[in-house]
Amino acid sequence: IIDVHEIDQIMTCSVWLKQVWIDKKLSWNPEIYGGVSVLYVPYEMVWVPDIVLYNTVDSNYNITISTKATLRYDGQVTWDSPAIFKTLCQIDVRWFPFDEQNCHFKFGSWTYTEDLLNLELLDSDARYELEMNENGELNNITIFEEGIDLSDYYPSVEWDIMSRIAKRRTKNYLTSFSDEAFIDIIFYLELRRKPLFYTVNLVFPCVGISFLTIVAFYLPPRSGEKVTLCILILVALTVFYLLLKDIIPATSIALPLFGKYLLFTMIMVSLSVLVTVISLNLHFRRPSTHRMPIWVKWLFLRILPKILFMRRPTLIKVDEAVRRVADYRRGYNMIINRYEQKVNCDSCRNVNKRITQEIQKIYRSPHVIKAFENVCFIAQLLKKKDREAMIDEDWKFVARVLDRLFLLLFSIACFLGTILILFQAPSLYDTRQAIN
């Protein structure tokens, strides 16, 4: 096997075609001719059957390599002709790169019908079956399990030969006179691709790139590289698609196995871009622009964190003393009374009375009231910022929960998708040994 060109669907093989027939006109008596029993003559000098390769894609149907034929005294003619055949081989890309192909060589006479030329295989055990022809009639066919001699076969670096069946059958062809029967012999080659090259250079890199999609959900939103990573993965997969286009034929019969995996990976990456955009949108939401719905709080702040084993970090709260200062308008009198009680005692009632009056003057002065109002404003501002910070942290935590959720979902999807798509090729479970 020289080459199997998938795009052009052509198989090129170098073969030895051995043909043996009896020509009584070429027999002689060796005793009369000095004991000569074998002659070697150019094949052009003797009659040769017009055996042609029906499914060739070359312009020459006949064998054109000039070799000599062997003539034996009893009229047996043996012609071993080396040739390079280019045959049409319909490529089945469904399981690429773990595919198996069935190619064949169809030989037969172009001129002589069944009555004039009989074709048989040499030295091979045969079995007989019935096959239905185009007219719905049953014809006898002869099947040879070892139809091709592989004793001098040079193993291909890309393909293994799994079987080499030959079939002899009779088929009717419409000629200029009538519908006449011709005998043809078809040699079938079942080839299984050696997947190591494409596994290392295509499958493994693509699997690695697809699992990089999971890393995008592990990046913190503040890094700003989540969408960039997803887009780069998408570009890398596009390059793999271009490589695949140059390897397999442009057929619409079936989608290649590797193409299915690439399509699955591109869908996953596209979804990851969408989810990443949603996650970034949630992360950078502010209380002034968005109000968190109740169901979002219930689902993303209570239920999912427990399922995903996530713990929310403790927030730094405003000091309680500042909160009490914020309640100045409501508890201002309580503050004054508290300080008045501190300076009241029975032993120094007169002095305390004077001190209390001074304290009341101080606490009720416009400057002190203004200072308390300013402190109250600052406290309210701190309370508002603290509340907004808590809501802001809620949105960020929702984004983290969403990332963790899709990190888990995409990990499961990528793993199961890789197993279910790539491991469905039948050749991976074919335990037959290749024919060496």
Swiss-Prot record:
Stretches in topological domain Cytoplasmic: 281-404
Chain positions carrying an annotated carbohydrate: 62, 140
Annotated family: Belongs to the ligand-gated ion channel (TC 1.A.9) family. Acetylcholine receptor (TC 1.A.9.1) subfamily.
Function: After binding acetylcholine, the AChR responds by an extensive change in conformation that affects all subunits and leads to opening of an ion-conducting channel across the plasma membrane.
UniProt KW keywords: Cell membrane, Disulfide bond, Glycoprotein, Ion channel, Ion transport, Ligand-gated ion channel, Membrane, Postsynaptic cell membrane, Receptor, Synapse, Transmembrane, Transmembrane helix, Transport
Transmembrane segments: 196-219, 227-245, 261-280, 405-423
Keyword Disulfide bond: yes
Extracellular-side positions: 1-195
Gene3D superfamilies the UniProt entry points to: Neurotransmitter-gated ion-channel ligand-binding domain (2.70.170.10), Neurotransmitter-gated ion-channel transmembrane domain (1.20.58.390)
One Gene Ontology cellular component annotation held by this UniProt entry: postsynaptic membrane
Annotated compartments: Postsynaptic cell membrane; Cell membrane
Protein name (record): Acetylcholine receptor non-alpha chain
